[in-house]
């Protein structure tokens, strides 16, 4: 079945995390990951691959922006894998792994997806990324000063708590769920690639 992994990341970003109504806590430069949420775990300062080694604050924030975006997409993708085993009105869902069904999409849907993803990514760039450098004529690959990674200013349901500690806890929860979802989505894809069939078929006729 088709998964939701192909959806534009920014189209769903606001659904996964509310925009802050409070001023984010300012961290000292000597804090792990410059004090960003997501480091509170039993392993402590966990960075075995050394991604943060020697990185300045804007670069660390850029990595967090990428992690948050991928986590949000993965949460929808994981949910999509489960839901679409039983509910797939647009696609049959019965002809092999999801990754093999991508070429089966009609051309008009590719056009719609391309335009939608392009507009969504343009919005995200305008919201958080540095402007074009007038000296080089190229866009800087860093976030704007003062931009909080993942904060696209979208909170239609008013979910963001007013208390700074509660808001940080919400950020911690989103990151934890996003990280788990990335592992889950990768597991779904790997399982389908190995078994050659859809996720639900691998476990038998889904009745949930």
Curated annotation (Swiss-Prot):
One of its GO terms (molecular function) is chlorophyll binding. Its main location: plastid. Keywords: Chlorophyll, Chloroplast, Chromophore, Light-harvesting polypeptide, Membrane, Photosynthesis, Photosystem II, Plastid, Thylakoid, Transit peptide, Transmembrane, Transmembrane helix. Induction: Expression is increased 5-fold under conditions of low light. The chain crosses the membrane at residues 102-118. GO terms for biological process: photosynthesis, light harvesting. This is Fucoxanthin-chlorophyll a-c binding protein, chloroplastic. Residues 1-31 form a transit peptide. InterPro entries: Chloro_AB-bd_pln, Chloroa_b-bind. It comes from the Eukaryota. It is found in: Plastid, Chloroplast thylakoid membrane. Belongs to the fucoxanthin chlorophyll protein family. GO terms for cellular component: chloroplast thylakoid membrane; light-harvesting complex; photosystem II. The light-harvesting complex (LHC) functions as a light receptor, it captures and delivers excitation energy to photosystems with which it is closely associated. Energy is transferred from the carotenoid and chlorophyll C (or B) to chlorophyll A and the photosynthetic reaction centers where it is used to synthesize ATP and reducing power. Pfam families: Chloroa_b-bind. The LHC complex of chromophytic algae is composed of fucoxanthin, chlorophyll A and C bound non-covalently by fucoxanthin chlorophyll proteins (FCPs). The ratio of pigments in this LHC is; fucoxanthin: chlorophyll C: chlorophyll A; (0.6-1): (0.1-0.3): (1).
């Amino acid at each position: 079945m088709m998964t939701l992994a192909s959806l534009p990341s920014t189209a769903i970003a606001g659904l996964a995390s509310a925009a802050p109504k409070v001023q984010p806590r300012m961290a000292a430069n000597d804090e792990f990951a410059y004090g960003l949420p997501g480091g509170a775990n039993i392993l402590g300062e966990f960075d075995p691959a050394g991604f943060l080694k020697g990185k300045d604050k804007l670069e660390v924030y850029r990595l967090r922006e990428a992690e948050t975006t991928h986590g949000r997409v993965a949460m929808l993708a994981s949910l999509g894998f489960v839901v679409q085993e039983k509910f797939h009105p647009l696609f049959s869902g019965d002809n092999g792994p999801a990754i093999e069904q991508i070429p089966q999409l009609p051309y008009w849907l590719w056009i719609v997806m391309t335009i939608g993803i392009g507009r969504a990514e343009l919005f995200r760039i305008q919201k958080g990324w540095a402007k074009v450098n007038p000296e080089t004529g190229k866009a800087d690959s860093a976030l704007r000063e003062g931009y909080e990674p993942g904060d696209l200013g979208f909170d239609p349901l008013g979910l963001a708590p007013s208390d700074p500690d509660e808001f940080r806890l919400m950020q911690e929860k989103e990151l934890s769920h996003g990280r788990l979802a990335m592992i889950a989505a990768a597991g779904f894809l790997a399982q389908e690639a190995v078994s050659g069939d859809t996720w639900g078929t691998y476990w038998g006729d889904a009745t949930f």
